[in-house]
UniProtKB/Swiss-Prot annotation:
The gene is yitZ. Keywords: Cell membrane, Membrane, Transmembrane, Transmembrane helix, Transport. This is Uncharacterized MFS-type transporter YitZ. It comes from Bacillus subtilis (strain 168). Disulfide bonds: none annotated. PANTHER family: MULTIDRUG RESISTANCE PROTEIN MDTG. Belongs to the major facilitator superfamily. The chain crosses the membrane at residues 25-45, 63-83, 120-140, 141-161.
């Protein structure tokens, strides 16, 4: 999941800025992202008592896979706002699901070390994906990078189903 999101992240920022006509719209769209994520966390907390955290990760993966197919076709600021709200919701599912999963699969004595290793590798793969995305953008269209990320998200969802 981290690889797929990092692959498109720099291009999405440029894409959002180019749709709007002001930095106010740009700031508002990112505010919607943060606010929508914040507002769903209490619900996710209650739902995590009833549902396995992998379901949150699965919803994030497949929701992002579908959403990224739509992103290259965004043509208005209102559409950017809607996408930002959905990105915030899916991002919250991913963050919440991964933290619960990490807590469930680590022992308290080794937890700090394992979480450190987890964050190291996710940061390394995120950085590699950002660099690869820049390289690929020189040879393909930015839209193709969004579609490739969509495929990666979908595949990560399939992998979660197989490991569940």
């Amino acid at each position: 999941m981290f690889f797929a999101s990092s692959l498109i992240f720099p291009f999405y920022i440029l894409f959002v800025k180019n749709i709007g006509s002001s930095y106010t719209q740009f700031g508002f769209s990112y505010g919607l992202f943060g606010l929508s994520g914040a507002l769903i966390y209490p619900l996710l907390g209650r739902l995590s008592e009833r549902f396995d955290s992998r379901y949150f990760l699965l919803l994030n993966s497949w929701g992002m896979a579908v959403l990224l197919l739509y992103v290259p076709h965004i043509g208005s600021v209102v559409q950017v706002y809607i996408v930002q709200v959905l990105l915030g919701l899916f991002g919250a599912m991913q963050k919440h699901g991964e933290k619960v999963l990490i807590a469930n699969f680590t022992d308290s004595g080794e937890r700090g070390k394992k979480i450190g290793n987890y964050h190291f590798w996710t940061a390394v793969f995120s950085a590699a994906a950002i660099m690869l995305g820049g390289f690929l953008a020189d040879f393909f269209t930015v839209q193709m990078i969004f579609y490739a990320s969509s495929i990666l998200y979908f595949l990560s969802g399939l992998m979660m189903m197989k490991t569940g």
